[in-house]
């Protein structure tokens, strides 16, 4: 899937460069910043596959991969949604920051304060979004940080090729620019709540969910499954987060501590912040949320990229207006599970 997605990206990029006359950059049809970021997002996922969206400030929102339209799901206080973070060390600097722009003032005032997941984590001070479907780029910067980050999202869409336009994948590239005259040790990690089985009717993962580490031909990553859910449920299935990158040090975890008073994300954050790597939690009681991390060196005044892909397989699509009739998904006939799609 990674090679297929990259080939599709190259084909689309060639067309886009001709169309938008942007030889070295991703194409841009519109630019958004300020208040506009609150309402813009790039849906990523093939035709008829569902989607995950890259928001204007870099969050991953609108998780609609389990056969149910569900705008705003995991955008608000439905627990800790998946997120990416960056740790930077070098040039007299050390910090850990969520890879997302600032929270809008309109999101701060609710019954219990801010209702945005991970609202207490440090974020980049500035964000803007450039879009030209199927491409979108979030630009992150902060005067207090020695790096700038571009988050490049890509949805599989190849005009004239319905098969390659119908893949259950959301592709992401995190390009880090070193603004200093010294090399920087940079780690990018993803915290992934095991949301398999959480289709919006239920915010809590069903009992028996599993998270496992896998390796394949040119790809490594995590697979999240809802093992004990009714296998006829539209929410039964799996999703995966993987990377084709081999030029860095990879670490991961397949479990986190239980979420008492938001302890899950805090313990994960502390683990990542300590050395830019992930390790298994020091706890006898765990839950199947996971994370994957890649540490690289970004040269002085240089740029380095991290590549990730979310894939999924939830085969039991119900008929429109009749949940008792399962019509299925075309993509599920081609892939046994989410890892097979990776």
Describe the function of each predicted region:
Residues 57-71, 312-319:
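Short, surface-exposed, low-complexity cationic segments
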């Amino acid at each position: 899937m990674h090679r297929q997605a990259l080939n599709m990206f190259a084909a689309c990029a060639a067309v886009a460069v001709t169309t938008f006359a942007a030889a070295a950059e991703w194409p841009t049809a519109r630019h958004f910043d300020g208040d506009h970021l609150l309402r813009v997002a790039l849906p990523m996922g093939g035709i008829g596959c569902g989607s995950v969206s890259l928001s204007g400030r870099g969050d991953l929102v609108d998780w609609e991969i389990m056969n149910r339209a569900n705008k705003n799901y995991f955008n608000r206080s439905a627990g800790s949604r998946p997120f990416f973070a960056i740790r930077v060390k070098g040039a007299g600097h050390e910090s850990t920051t969520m890879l997302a722009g600032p929270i809008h003032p309109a999101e701060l005032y609710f019954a219990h304060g801010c209702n945005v997941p991970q609202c207490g984590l440090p974020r980049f001070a500035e964000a803007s979004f450039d879009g030209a479907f199927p491409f979108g780029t979030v630009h992150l910067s902060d005067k207090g940080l020695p790096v700038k980050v571009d988050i490049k999202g890509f949805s599989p869409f190849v005009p004239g090729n319905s098969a390659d336009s119908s893949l259950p994948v959301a592709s992401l590239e995190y390009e880090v620019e070193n603004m200093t005259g010294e090399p920087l040790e940079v780690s990018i990690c993803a915290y992934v709540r095991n949301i398999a089985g959480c289709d919006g009717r239920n915010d809590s993962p069903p009992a028996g969910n599993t998270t496992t580490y896998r390796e394949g031909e040119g790809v490594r990553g995590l697979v999240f499954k809802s093992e004990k859910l009714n296998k006829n449920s539209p929410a039964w299935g799996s999703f995966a987060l993987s990377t084709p990158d081999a030029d860095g040090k990879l670490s991961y975890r397949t479990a986190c501590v239980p979420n008492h008073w938001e302890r899950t994300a805090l313990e994960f954050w502390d683990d990542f912040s300590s050395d830019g790597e992930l390790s298994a939690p020091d706890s006898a009681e765990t839950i199947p949320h996971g994370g994957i991390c890649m540490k690289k060196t970004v040269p002085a005044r240089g740029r380095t990229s991290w590549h990730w892909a979310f894939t999924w397989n939830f085969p039991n699509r119900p008929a429109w207006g009749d949940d008792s009739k399962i019509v299925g998904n075309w993509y599920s006939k081609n892939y046994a599970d989410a890892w097979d799609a990776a």
